[in-house]
């Protein structure tokens, strides 16, 4: 169960719930992110289209995403709606929920290594990482990319740094994205081969110097065509590096009297 940061949800908040009991007039749910707090789903908030029975829509044990529509703070009563949740909201919330569960399992493993409880781990490092990166799993992904620096920046106590680093690298994988295309570099000069090499090296160096996260491959597919492949953790980094490399490559080519063009592959 995800760690509870506050006692009650806010009106308008999307929450993950487990259906507990279903009656003709509505259903009772437990809110997974709020320590099993009970919520009521009125029959009128079950579906936007006509359905014969509430039992056709929700069943005991089912995991659903609902929107909070009323909160009585004094009585700690919460009413929710299923019909006001769009498909995209449901998918996004369930993804966030699964990411939170995975992140907390990793945090629990680290806590066990240090002889701490999950609650102690959350107080010591979880809150800091959430406050700094917005989400625990987002913090862990940043650690995969940047290493222990990402933990220290968020104020993680030193005793937690190495255990966190070990478990994060063991359990979290950040997918890399790719851009590819073909450079056409041609020279009819007597020393054309050397001129072409200089242009290609300019492009490759510009990419490698733009970010340590980028992996670059540049190889011939049959002169004067050369395949360029860039790989990193996000497209923004790649686009910036590619634009700079092509600009520098074109300038070098122009100064050497070399034909230069780039055709990008569709993704």
UniProtKB/Swiss-Prot annotation:
Keywords: Initiation factor, Protein biosynthesis, RNA-binding. SMART domains: S1 (SM00316). Residues 12-83 form the S1 motif domain. GO terms for molecular function: ribosome binding; RNA binding; translation initiation factor activity. Disulfide bonds: none annotated. It holds the Pfam family EIF_2_alpha. Heterotrimer composed of an alpha, a beta and a gamma chain. Belongs to the eIF-2-alpha family. NCBIfam families: PRK03987.1-1, PRK03987.1-4. eIF-2 functions in the early steps of protein synthesis by forming a ternary complex with GTP and initiator tRNA. HAMAP family: eIF_2_alpha. This is Translation initiation factor 2 subunit alpha. The lineage of its organism: Archaea, Thermoproteota, Thermoprotei, Desulfurococcales, Pyrodictiaceae.
